[in-house]
Amino acid sequence: MRKPIVPFDDIWKNVVNAAQALEPIPDALGDVYLVRNLYGTVRISVSDAVEGDESCLAALQRLARRLHEVLGAHGVLQENGILFVTDAFLKSIQGGKREVRPNVYLVDRLVTASDWWTVGEPPFPGKAARYTLYSVKGGVGRSTTAAVLAWHLARNGKRVLVMDLDLESPGLSSAVLEPDRRPDYGITDWFVEALVGQGEQVIGRMTAAPRWAQDFDGDVRIAPAHGRESGEYLAKLGRVYMDTDVDPWPVRLHRLLMSLENECTPDVVLLESRSGLHDIAAATVTDVAAHVLLFATDSESNWTDYRILFRHWQQHDLAEQIRERLSIVSALTPEFDTERYLQRFQEGAWDLFRDHLYDDVEAPDSADGFSFDLDDDDAPHDPLVIHWTRGLAAGASLHDLKHSTVSLAYASFLDRFDRLARAGSPREQ
């Protein structure tokens, strides 16, 4: 008879139970890493400095034997379950570690999605307020909203930098910039030129201002995905996300962001993120100290996808670090039965935040936790509302934004955004 399957989703639960039931580990052993590799099998990694220590080896063998017993096909034979590695290797895998008992850590080795594992401050913090426009699904109006926000902020005297980081589906520049005003270079050009030390030589030629912003008290600069001519766009795109020997992709993104902020000196930076759960989106959500506008519609598929992301943050103890950076956006709010739709949307958003990012406390100002009432209109789950209108349905309208059209669709959104901006992002507080 075959043994019952141990599915992938049960790996960490079984590993945690095995590690926590283990007798005390000798201090001489140092840190112990339980590493799930790309195939989903788990091995123990420790410093090769303890390889000859019999007491340490005995403790490791007990743990390896127990892991083999509880992991099924995701385990390995006891004799193959212990890896003695260099201290340099141990240091290289520490970024996504979780402690399950003193000096015992879980680590995932991933091809993608590893950037969702941490929430941190950028290595090169800027002076501008940063906002990321993100969604788990496309087609929810992020590009239009980036243009409207830039229009609104510039009319009120702000200097605004808009970066089109939805590189797999570029379109912001063509929707906002007239063909004769597009810059020579774009974001993909910077990434490939920076590989050979020419990044700073294109920075001054990769932003441009839309004609509709020329009479405003402020300023708008658009950094498009590509320049006036797309050139070998796919060949460049294939090199954008690579890690170099010196810097991983998120650090390269920070360098671009800082270079553009130094060049344009904006008050506000708007980052149009790629949609979905890929690492590329993660960098703009978790790593640039931006306030994140989460675009959603009231559909079960949207809430399901957001639950995947929120549950991940909850399980990896990241809720406290990320939750106050988030604000949900009701995108494409329908023209008819709007009140009932928004009530359902708010309840869905509250369920999402309450179940995964809020603490289970009665009062929002409790010293022991963090929570919000359903009807708290400054809470992350309370939506910034964008109304669907025919006037903004066509991308061409972004070349010539009209106050009446914007007011019809975005009046509520912009009022709430201004209140959010006055309160300040977590990085500024």
Predicted regions mapped to residue ranges:
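Long, basic/Gly/Ser/Thr-rich N-terminal segments
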Residues: 1-110, 114
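Beta-strand-loop-alpha "switch" segments that mediate conformational coupling across diverse proteins
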Residues: 37, 54, 78-87, 227, ...
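Pre-Walker A adenine-sensing motif
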Residues: 113-125
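Walker A/P-loop phosphate-binding motif and the immediately C-terminal alpha-helix
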Residues: 126-169
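Active-site signature of alpha/beta-hydrolase-fold catalytic machinery across serine-
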Residues: 148, 152, 175, 283
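P-loop/Walker-type NTP enzyme "switch/lid" segment
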Residues: 167-262
